[in-house]
Curated annotation (Swiss-Prot):
Family that this chain belongs to: Belongs to the CsrA/RsmA family.
Gene3D superfamilies named among the record's database cross-references: Translational regulator CsrA
Official protein name in the record: Translational regulator CsrA
GO cellular component, one term: cytosol
Phylogenetic placement of the source organism: Bacteria, Pseudomonadati, Thermodesulfobacteriota, Desulfovibrionia, Desulfovibrionales
Source organism per UniProt: Oleidesulfovibrio alaskensis (strain ATCC BAA-1058 / DSM 17464 / G20) (Desulfovibrio alaskensis)
Amino acid sequence: MLILTRRPGESLYLGDTIKITVLSVQGKQIKIGLDVPGDMTVYREEVYMRVRDQNRQALETSDADLLAATQLWHAKKK
């Protein structure tokens, strides 16, 4: 992990297109501003982890789950 020290108003770049600016520091809270290209998605870590875990869980569908879903679908079709 790269550790950098920045003061409010100071920035750093990731590559050529991502600019991170320290906006303020108040106690244990740091506000940052992100300038990123419009086609890039930015997630807070806790949101990213939750979505990742849900996607992994969705991939763990068992044969029994598929059979139950098929039976429900056929039952509704009648």
